[in-house]
From Swiss-Prot:
Principal location: mitochondrion
Top EC class of this enzyme: oxidoreductase
Source organism: Imperata cylindrica
Name of the protein: Malate dehydrogenase, mitochondrial
Family to which this protein belongs: Belongs to the LDH/MDH superfamily. MDH type 1 family.
One biological process term in Gene Ontology: tricarboxylic acid cycle
Catalytic function, reaction form: (S)-malate + NAD(+) = oxaloacetate + NADH + H(+)
């Protein structure tokens, strides 16, 4: 999860394109 969160923080545009809620949540945790 931590790795996915780090990836989410770096690749927010990618997460938006994927529209993956879990990915977005992980990105939010990192920020």
């Amino acid at each position: 999860v931590a790795i996915l969160g780090a990836a989410g923080g770096i690749g927010q545009p990618l997460s938006l394109l994927m529209k993956d809620d879990l990915f977005n949540i992980n990105a939010g945790i990192v920020k």
